[in-house]
Amino acid sequence: MNKITKANFKKLVLVLTLTLAMTLGMSISVFAATGAVNGYTATGSSTITRTAASASTRYGKSTGSISVDSTYSYVNTYTLATGTSTKSTGYYTSVYVDFSAPYNCHSVRIRSSHKVSAYGQTWTANSTAVY
């Protein structure tokens, strides 16, 4: 019977840790971008899970305008047919859109464009999350 050496044990622990991290990482994906408009923080993010996705744009001051435009892609797990859905919204301080995959479908990707305009300045960013 083979003995487990200290070096082999370390390799085994490393492989198991990486496998666990990759498995957990596949369950949710998040991408966020951060900037500033007139000294206040602007953040845009996209999040995706197996059957849902969401995107948001936030601004640290309740003035000006903010928006998020998102396209969500999904695939039918039986027919492999693909589909997309698009949503847009705009307001002050914080905006949010969410999507749910249709029956027998799972998420593929969400792409979002974020925009904050205030005090004569504009911040834009794109975010993509993939399942």
Regions found by a protein language model. Name each.
Residues 1-50:
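N-terminal prepro-regions of secreted/extracellular proteins
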Residues 31-131:
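Post-signal peptide N-terminal regions of Sec-secreted extracellular proteins
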